[in-house]
C-alpha cells in the first residue's frame, strides 16, 4: 500500500477580520503571506523524490504551477472567530473527498525545506504521525509542560476523519481555547506517533 499516497499543502491568504486575544496582528499575518512561489518550490522539492500526486488546498490559486492539483476552499466562515488563524485549516484536510482515494496522505507546511531523503516519511505506516520537536529540548518541555512537543509542519495520516468529526463538535470552542492544531492534538489527547 505504500505506493498509494499523495502529498498535500495548504495556502490560505485570507486574513482574519477581527483580531483579539493575542495582541499582535503580525502573529496572524505571518501565516497569510505565503505566495504561490512557496507552493511551487515545495512541489518541486517533493517532485525530485516522488511522482505521487501533489494537492494544494487554497483560497487563492493565482500563480500556482499547473501540474499541481489545486482545490479551492472557502474559509470565510472562520474569519470572524476569535483566535482563528490559517493553521486551523489543516484539520479541514482530514475530511476532503479529493484525498479519499489515497491510502496515505503526507502534508508539508509551505515553509518546509526538503534537503534530505523523504523515503522514511513516505514509508512511515502509522495512522497519524507528527514531527517530534527534538530541537525544543528538555528545558522547553520543563518550562512548558502543558505544551506539545509535536509539530504539525509535516503530518502523515491514513484516516483522520475521526479527528475531524471530534473537532467539528466544537470547532469555535477549540479555536478560541488553543493556540493551534499542535496544542489541540496534545491537550485533547489525540492519539499520534512521532515521525
Model-derived segments and their meaning:
Residues 1-80, 99-101:
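N-terminal anchoring/stem segment of glycosyltransferases
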Residues 12-15, 60-63, 75-78, 112-114, ...:
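Short, solvent-exposed loop/turn segments at secondary-structure junctions
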Residues 34-41, 86-89, 176-181:
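Soluble or luminal CAZymes and related metallo-dependent hydrolases
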Residues 50, 90, 108, 150-153, ...:
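Residues that flank catalytic or metal-binding motifs in active/ligand-binding sites
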Residues 70-72, 86-138, 157:
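GT-A fold catalytic core of metal-dependent nucleotide-sugar glycosyltransferases
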Residues 77-89:
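A short, glycine-/small-residue-rich helix N-cap motif at loop->alpha-helix starts
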Residues 80-81, 139-145:
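Short, P/G- and charge-enriched loop/turn segments at secondary-structure junctions
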Residues 152-195:
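Catalytic core and acceptor-binding pocket of nucleotide-sugar-dependent glycosyltransferases
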